[in-house]
Amino acid sequence: MTPRPRRDQERTGGGDGIGRSRAGPGREVWAARLLTFSAGAVNALGFLALGGVFTSVVTANSALVGIGVGHADAAPAVLAGLAVLGYVLGAASGGWAAARVRRARRAAAADFLLLELLLLWAVAAWWLRLDGHPGGWVRTTLLVLLSAAMGCQNAGVLVALGARAPTAYLTGLLTHAVTDAVTEGRLRWRAPATVGLLVAGAAGLALLERWLHGVAAVAPAVLVTGAWLLWRTDGAAPHAPAAGRAGRERGTAG
C-alpha cells in the first residue's frame, strides 16, 4: 500500500487524529476530548450512585447479566440488562439523528448531540430535585437514561467522524494501538491519551460525587454542552463514510 503524501497527512491528520492541521488541533478536536472526559464522568456516576453498573461498557454489563443468572440473583442481572437495553436504544437513536444531520446541509454536524443533551439534562434536573438520592425505580430509570445518552454519543460520533474519534468506545482503539506497536513498531500516543481522559473524567466525577453529591449529575450535562458549543462553532465536521465503515468492520467491544 503506497503511503499517502505528507501534505495529505497534514491535512487529514494522518489517520491518527481528527481535523488536525499545521495550526494544531481545532475546536472539533477539543469537543471530542470533552466528550471522552464526560463519558468517564457518566460511567463513574452510574457505577457509584446508580447501582454499580456502567453506562457504556456493554462487555462488562453483559457479563454482569450472566453472573446474576449464574448466581440466581435477579437484581444485578436486571439492572445490567436494562443498562444494555438503554445503550442499544440510545445508539439507534443517536446514529439515526447523526445520519439525518449529516444529510441536512443547513444543520451543524454537532447537532446530533442535542439528543444526548436532552437525556443528560433530564437526569441532572431529576437528580437535583431529589438532592442526589434517587431510589427504587427512579434510580433504575436514571441509569437507563444515562446508558441511552452514552449510546447516543458513541453511535453519533461514529456516524459523524467515523473511526477517527471514539469517545467512550475505547477497547478497539487501545487494541489497535498495542497491535500497531508490536507489529509495526509504531506507537500511537492518541490511544493512551484518550484512555487517560476517560480516567480523569471518572476521577473528577468521583470527587464531585463525594464532596458535592447533590450536584454531581450536572457535571456530565455541562461537559457535553460545552462540547456541542465548541463543535458547532467550528462549523460542519468533515464526513468520513470510509472511516465509519472501517470502524464498524473492527467490531470492537466497549
Predicted regions and their residues:
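Alpha-helical transmembrane segments of multi-pass membrane proteins
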Residues: 2-238, 243-254
